[in-house]
């Protein structure tokens, strides 16, 4: 199942000495044994998908935080996962960069990608999530359909949280 799951972390975890294109082709070539040309084709498609294809020849240090996170997303997509896991993908970004990354994730959701997202971005979650799990101190406090979670929270802790952020 690991081969069918892509991950995007809080930190971008890009190889600083490799170009954006090489960051995206490394795993498909080494893990999936794809020919370099095919891996580059897939990488360019995914860089286009997250709107940074024009950055392919640059190195991570030459990109903004939002561009680096979108590169990390493209890199994960190059493995053609069925499920994407996101661990606070916007937490290391400046506010103006957050929208860039969330827009790319919204596009994935609209394309039908199954995503499990750890986030504090409730507007984003409300827009794209089918189901919500609210956790506090590592414990599940509430599970609900997104509409019910926001419209009719059950636990006092969830109500308090929503009253503070909405």
Locations of regions flagged by a protein language model:
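C-terminal boundary and immediately downstream tail of ABC-type ATPase nucleotide-binding domains
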Residues: 143, 147-166
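ABC family nucleotide-binding domain
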Residues: 1-146
């Amino acid at each position: 199942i690991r081969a069918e799951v892509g991950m995007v972390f809080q930190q971008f975890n890009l190889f600083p000495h490799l170009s954006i294109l090489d960051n995206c082709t490394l795993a498909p070539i080494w893990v999936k044994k794809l020919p370099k040309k095919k891996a580059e084709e897939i990488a360019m498609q995914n860089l286009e998908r997250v709107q940074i294809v024009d950055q392919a020849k640059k190195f991570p240090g030459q990109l903004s935080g939002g561009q680096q996170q979108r590169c990390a997303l493209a890199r994960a997509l190059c493995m053609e996962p069925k499920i994407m896991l996101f661990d606070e993908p916007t937490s290391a970004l400046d506010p103006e960069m957050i929208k860039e990354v969330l827009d790319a994730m919204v596009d994935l959701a609209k394309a039908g990608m199954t995503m499990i997202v750890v986030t504090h971005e409730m507007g984003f979650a409300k827009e794209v999530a089918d189901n919500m799990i609210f956790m506090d101190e590592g414990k599940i406090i509430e599970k609900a359909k997104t509409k019910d979670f926001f419209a009719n929270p059950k636990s006092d802790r969830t109500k308090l949280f929503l009253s503070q952020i909405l």
